[in-house]
Amino acid sequence: MTQEFDCVVIGAGPSGYVAAITAAQSKLRTALIEEDQAGGTCLNRGCIPSKALIAGANVVSHIKHAEQFGIHVDGYTIDYPAMAKRKNTVVQGIRQGLEGLIRSNKITVLKGTGSLVSSTEVKVIGQDTTIIKANHIILATGSEPRPFPGVPFSSRILSSTGILELEVLPKKLAIIGGGVIGCEFASLFHTLGVEITVIEALDHILAVNNKEVSQTVTNKFTKQGIRILTKASISAIEESQNQVRITVNDQVEEFDYVLVAIGRQFNTASIGLDNAGVIRDDRGVIPVDETMRTNVPNIYAIGDITGKWLLAHVASHQGVIAAKNISGHHEVMDYSAIPSVIFTHPEIAMVGLSLQEAEQQNLPAKLTKFPFKAIGKAVALGASDGFAAIVSHEITQQILGAYVIGPHASSLIGEMTLAIRNELTLPCIYETVHAHPTLSEVWAEGALLATNHPLHFPPKS
């Protein structure tokens, strides 16, 4: 007997499970199809396991700098298998919690791969092989790491998934690709004592981000001892039993492992799009409107496959928007205030427009930077390097963008995200009492400096 649902979601990653929960809470009969583990790449093979390892690396960093706090450590060892075990325990615990959430919302979970048979039918192949009917379908099949052209992933040529499965630390690691993923792993493994070489084809790393951010990270990495090769051309990658040889700029270099971090490819080739008449472009991206609807009125697409921002928090919000529209509430996706974070050391976070982007839109904008060395809490933490920057409208004082390089940037960016989303002005920030001593004071101080009324920094002459 064919099961019928109001809403069927294919893929249980950050976009899919959030869409399913939102739909179920709107009283829609909801099914969620997943071939692997709930949580998708983010929980199982990306965001969470990498941040669990980074947490361990941060402990190492604190130990290395313990003497400045009057604490003398007589030596330490890095038990990487134990770090990896903790990472797996963290992931398992969160996944179990997620599975409980899905059950508590009375969502029907079907194990297997889902593909479209028509615009209202989905075939499931796997543990729960069946064909189900749905009034609405949400595609949330995500993406996967892109291999280097002509070089498949292997035991030594690793994707971002493969490197998280290592149980021993390499001595020498090459990272092909100086984007966010490449830089995060470079920072992580360098802190753990691995010799790192970042190989980037463009003339600078983090090429898609703010130029000042790129230069700052380059300077920090170089100072830390991370080797960066830009304008690099790779002509060969050869794997042997114990090493990988890379020919870069006509020079042969040897490494224990290679991480390929050159982007991701979209999982849309085998989900039956043609059977339902759903359009995708040459990259595999499924075009959607502001409600996440595809060209087929009852089929929606969310997450990486929309080709917007390949970020878990964007995917989740797209899931909410799609489910809300299916349940009869007209809501649209707003990309004006999307925070992005780079979990290097130091952390980096940004949201909204850069000064260059604001000027390209012919906005009368100004950039104000406030240093952490003038923030008491940062000095007390021994983390006074870096700054927070605000891009504001010179006439209206509306906050247009912000970025921060320094301690706990990933948490600090939330205030500016709220400000930009709600079109707040500089006075909205500095007239709000910020607790002292906290790092968040950097925004109040920065907003005051932008109006040339700084309290803890010399005024501009």
UniProtKB/Swiss-Prot annotation:
As cofactor, the record names:
FAD
Which cysteine pairs are covalently linked by disulfides here?
Answer: 42-47
Q: Does the keyword Oxidoreductase apply?
A: yes
Q: Which gene encodes it?
A: lpdA
Q: Which SUPFAM superfamilies match?
A: FAD/NAD(P)-binding domain, FAD/NAD-linked reductases, dimerisation (C-terminal) domain
According to UniProt, the name of this protein is: Dihydrolipoyl dehydrogenase
Q: Which UniProt keywords apply?
A: Cytoplasm, Disulfide bond, FAD, Flavoprotein, NAD, Oxidoreductase, Redox-active center
The UniProt family comment states:
Belongs to the class-I pyridine nucleotide-disulfide oxidoreductase family.
Short name of any one Pfam family annotated for the protein: Pyr_redox_2
Q: Quick check: keyword Kinase in the entry?
A: no
- Reaction catalysed? N(6)-[(R)-dihydrolipoyl]-L-lysyl-[protein] + NAD(+) = N(6)-[(R)-lipoyl]-L-lysyl-[protein] + NADH + H(+)
Annotated localization = Cytoplasm
> What is the species listed in this Swiss-Prot or TrEMBL entry?
Chlamydia pneumoniae (Chlamydophila pneumoniae)
Q: What class of enzyme is it?
A: oxidoreductase
Taxonomic lineage? Bacteria, Pseudomonadati, Chlamydiota, Chlamydiia, Chlamydiales
As recorded in UniProt, its EC number(s) are 1.8.1.4
Q: Which GO terms describe its cellular component?
A: cytoplasm
- Looking at the UniProt entry, the stretches that span the membrane are none
Catalytic center residues: 436 (proton acceptor)
Q: Name one GO biological process term.
A: 2-oxoglutarate metabolic process
Textual note on the cofactor: Binds 1 FAD per subunit.
